[in-house]
Amino acid sequence: MASRRVLSSLLRSSSGRSAAKLGNRNPRLPSPSPARHAAPCSYLLGRVAEYATSSPASSAAPSSAPAKDEGKKTYDYGGKGAIGRVCQVIGAIVDVRFEDQEGLPPIMTSLEVQDHPTRLVLEVSHHLGQNVVRTIAMDGTEGLVRGRKVLNTGAPITVPVGRATLGRIMNVLGEPIDERGEIKTEHYLPIHRDAPALVDLATGQEILATGIKVVDLLAPYQRGGKIGLFGGAGVGKTVLIMELINNVAKAHGGFSVFAGVGERTREGNDLYREMIESGVIKLGEKQSESKCALVYGQMNEPPGARARVGLTGLTVAEYFRDAEGQDVLLFIDNIFRFTQANSEVSALLGRIPSAVGYQPTLASDLGALQERITTTKKGSITSVQAIYVPADDLTDPAPATTFAHLDATTVLSRQISELGIYPAVDPLDSTSRMLSPHILGEEHYNTARGVQKVLQNYKNLQDIIAILGMDELSEDDKLTVARARKIQRFLSQPFHVAEIFTGAPGKYVDLKENINSFQGLLDGKYDDLSEQSFYMVGGIDEVVAKAEKIAKESAA
C-alpha cells in the first residue's frame, strides 16, 4: 500500500498535465491509442499510474452510494440517451447509432426522425451491436442523410381506435389521409399485440349469411371464422369483397374494417366512393352512423408500410371486439401483398430466401397476423381475405401457407368468368368446414351435396360431349346436363356494387329461399324453363317471371 501511495503522488502531477492537454482537444474525437501514438516510456508510465491509482480488490470498501435499481429501465425520452443518429440508409432500411446502451430501443420500437420535412417513422428490426439498430422505414427515405437525429419513442407504432375511426381513412401510422381533419379519440393501441389466450376463445359455430347464393349454399362462412378469396388477377375478388361489406352492413348492422394492403390506389378510392353512395360511410354530422373504417397501405407505399398496415387494420378491429364486445368484419385486400411486402423487407434485411424466393419466416409472419383474428367470449372478428394466386398456381408457398389458417375458401375461377357467370365462384373447388349436417341441418346439407353432385357429373361428361356430342348421351345424362347448365347459370347473381356497370339492380337472397330454390331445381320442378331465364337473377320467383317475359317476347 505504501508503494502505491508513493507512485500515486509522484505521477499525479504528470497525469494532470496530460489531462489538461487532452482537454483542449475536440471532445468528440476519440483519444489516440497509447500503443500506436505514445512513446514506450510514456506508455509504461501510464500503465504504472493506472496500477498506482487503482484499489486492490482485497481492500475495497463497501460503497456508501445506494444501489441502482436493476429492474425494468425507463428511458428519459427527452434526454441525451434517447437520441440516435442515422449512420446508414439503404432504400427502406435505415441504420441508427445510439450513444449508449441505456438509450438503445427494443425490437419493434418505433423511432421518429427529427428535423425531417415530413414525419418519418422507423421500426426497429435488428440489433447489430456497437449500439447500432437496423430499422424499417414506414415512408419514403428520400432526402434522409447520415447524421440526422432520431428519437426513441419507447413504444411500438400506436394508432387511434374506437368509433372515431368509422368513416375515416387512415394510413399505417393511424394518420388520417382523407383530408377531413384529425381523428379525435382518447383510445390508442399498439399494432404489435399478443393473440388472445386459449381460455378466452369461444367455440360456438354459427353461419354468417351473406345474401350471395353460391356462398351461402355451397361454402357458407362461419361467424368469427377466416375466409379466403382465391383467384388470379381480374376475376372479381375486390368486387366480391365490396358486395360482402355492403350486404353484411345492411343485413347485420355490424362494423367493418377494411385493410387495403398493397392494392391499387384507384380501387381504394372507388371503394370509398361506393361506400359513401351506398350509405355504409356517411359524411358530415352523420359520420357517427358510418359502419366501416378503412386503413390503406397501397401499391406505391414502401414495403415497411405494406408489411404493417394489415396489423393496423387488425388492431382497429380488435378494439371493437374486446372493448365493445362487437362482431366485427375484417376485410383484407390483399393478404398476398402482405406476404410480398414481408418478402421485400426480408431481402433488404439480408436474410437468405426460402422456396420460390419467399422469406424464411413466411409461416411465422403470417401466423402472427392470423392468430389474432379469432372469436373470444367478448366478441368476434370474421375475416374475409382476398388472396391473389400467382400464375393461378394454388401450390405457390404464399397461398398454400394461408390455407392452414382458413375455415372456408371461396375460389374464383377464370373459366367460369369467361362464361360470363358472376360471381365467378367455383362451386366444386370452394370449401367450408361449416358444410356439415350437424351445423347446417339435413335439408341444407343434402341440397348442397345434391347441387355439387350434378355439377360434378356434368364436368365428367364434358369430354364425351366435346368428342361425340350431346346426341350420344343417355336420357339420364341429357337430363343431368340440362339441370347442371341451369344450376350453373342460377349461381350467378347481380351485385349492388356493380349496378352502375351492369344496369341490373343488386339482389340479396335469403338463406331459406336459396335452399328451397335449388332443391326445386334438383327435384325437376323447373325443367321446362329455358336456361336463359336462370341467368343473373335473385330468387326462383324472378326466374319464373323472367321465363314468362321471354316467352311473351318470343311469341310477339
Curated annotation (Swiss-Prot):
Q: What residues bear Phosphoserine in this entry?
A: S59
Q: What ranges does the record list as Low complexity composition bias?
A: 1-20
The GO biological-process annotations, alphabetized, read as: proton motive force-driven mitochondrial ATP synthesis
Q: Where is the transit peptide?
A: 1-51
Note down the stretches annotated as region Disordered: 1-37
Gene Ontology molecular functions: ATP binding; ATP hydrolysis activity; proton-transporting ATP synthase activity, rotational mechanism
Which reaction equations make up its catalytic activity? Answer: ATP + H2O + 4 H(+)(in) = ADP + phosphate + 5 H(+)(out)
Entry GO terms, CC: mitochondrial inner membrane; proton-transporting ATP synthase complex
Q: What keywords tag this UniProt record?
A: ATP synthesis, ATP-binding, CF(1), Hydrogen ion transport, Ion transport, Membrane, Mitochondrion, Mitochondrion inner membrane, Nucleotide-binding, Phosphoprotein, Transit peptide, Translocase, Transport
Query: In the Enzyme Commission scheme, what number(s) does this protein have?
Result: 7.1.2.2
Highest taxon of the lineage? Eukaryota
Where does the chain bind ATP? G231, G232, A233, G234, V235, G236, K237, T238
Q: Which PROSITE patterns does its entry note?
A: ATPASE_ALPHA_BETA
Q: Name one Pfam family in it.
A: ATP-synt_VA_C
Q: Where in the cell is it found?
A: Mitochondrion; Mitochondrion inner membrane
Q: Which NCBIfam families match?
A: atpD
| Protein family | Belongs to the ATPase alpha/beta chains family.
Quaternary structure?
F-type ATPases have 2 components, CF(1) - the catalytic core - and CF(0) - the membrane proton channel. CF(1) has five subunits: alpha(3), beta(3), gamma(1), delta(1), epsilon(1). CF(0) has three main subunits: a, b and c.
Function text = Mitochondrial membrane ATP synthase (F(1)F(0) ATP synthase or Complex V) produces ATP from ADP in the presence of a proton gradient across the membrane which is generated by electron transport complexes of the respiratory chain. F-type ATPases consist of two structural domains, F(1) - containing the extramembraneous catalytic core, and F(0) - containing the membrane proton channel, linked together by a central stalk and a peripheral stalk. During catalysis, ATP synthesis in the catalytic domain of F(1) is coupled via a rotary mechanism of the central stalk subunits to proton translocation.
Q: What is this protein called?
A: ATP synthase subunit beta-1, mitochondrial
